[in-house]
Amino acid sequence: AGLEAARASAERGYDVALAEAGTTLGGRVARERHLPGLSAWGRVADYREYQLSQKANVESYFDSELDAESILEFGFENVCIATGAKWRRDGVSRQHVVPFPTDGAMPLFTPDDLMSGAAPTGHVVIYDDDHYYMGGVMAELLIQKGCSVTLVTPAAYVSEWTLNTLEQHEIHRRLANMGVAIE
């Protein structure tokens, strides 16, 4: 959303200063493009990054974490803040609106942790209350890293929302063929 807001603003003639806290533009899409089966998603970020690079009214700043004071010092007339999305660690999701009780001794990993390189070993249980693509993709990633995986979902189907994109049967088949236990 941040890159698209910057691109659309530049297209409308606004001077745009794009401050990126890290070294890579594209937010979640830039991270998720490295997950199994999602490499094509990189086109979303690549297109916007290219469009921004062609505009004389756009300046990009990397490793530029800003606070409110820094933003005010710039003196911009309009400010759009895209802070990115983070996966919750406490189990709050679509079906569960209160945190799950957890055992502090048991390691918990979010998709953000796995995309950052952290990885469990051995048998892993994935609780998928996203119902779209992430649970299946995380299961595939962990199988590739040598884990055995049980995917648990409260939905009727694994990656249930992918019924709308006609991908659900293929996702289920692929996970079953990899040895993912689906409950």
Which residues fall in each region the model found?
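Short beta-loop-alpha junction of Rossmann-like oxidoreductase domains
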Residues: 27-29
